[in-house]
Amino acid sequence: MKNNPFSLSFGKEPVSLINRNVQSYEIIDTFEDENPTYQVCMITGVRGSGKTVMLTEINKTFRAEEDWIVIDLSPERDLLQSFAANLSNYPSLSEVFREAKINLSFLGLGVEIEGVSPITDLNVAVTRMLEKIKKKHKRVLVTIDEAVCNDTMKEFVSLFQIYMRQDLPVFLLMTGLYENIYELQNEKTLTFLYRAPKIELRPLNIGMIAEKYKSIF
């Protein structure tokens, strides 16, 4: 007997997918636009509706593009610290930051640069790195799976809003259950999330699953 092609381990893509191309292409096309109409998007729905799978597919699309830097963050860790660490250690960027004399040694994120005072504030460090990325005509996509309304998430999303206001090339794609997204956007400093598009994934249609089974077996 063949294995179930739709079985899904946590965070892992299944062998077979039910296409939701319209929603995925909408996000991809908007983020890639020269003047994107939005830079934050949330994918929501009940458990098992395919949120993580869609996030993974979009993630793979952008990773294949040279002018995109894709960073995956966990909502259970210090998001700003993780974001800074991922940027500073990104293979194609570490030398760029070194040449730009961005000294991150005080924060434990890079080597000492002789003759350059180290940056002592994490947010300042991230801003400096993003400014350099912008000059290189690259964009940064941050993905967060299963967003929750905790302190580190509130701090990071609040700062992300500032980066967007500063016209820095940052994009945020999050998944989350209805109740978690609702709680997050109702924070006093995060009401801008109300204006961010939300793609609601409904439970998979039985007919779609049946047709997919027919095409496989």
Please give the residue ranges for each predicted region.
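A short, basic N-terminal segment
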Residues: 1-41, 89
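Walker A/P-loop nucleotide-binding motif
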Residues: 36-57
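Conserved catalytic segments around the Walker B and adjacent sensor/switch elements
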Residues: 41-42, 56, 60-78
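Conserved nucleotide-binding/hydrolysis micro-motifs of P-loop NTPases
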Residues: 48, 76-79, 149, 177-182, ...
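Conserved NTP-binding/hydrolysis module of P-loop NTPases
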Residues: 67, 78-109, 114
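Conserved Walker B catalytic segment
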Residues: 115-180, 186-189
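A short helix-turn-beta junction within AAA+ P-loop NTPase domains corresponding to the substrate/partner-engaging
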Residues: 186-203
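Conserved small helical "lid"/interfacial subdomain of P-loop NTPases
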Residues: 201-217
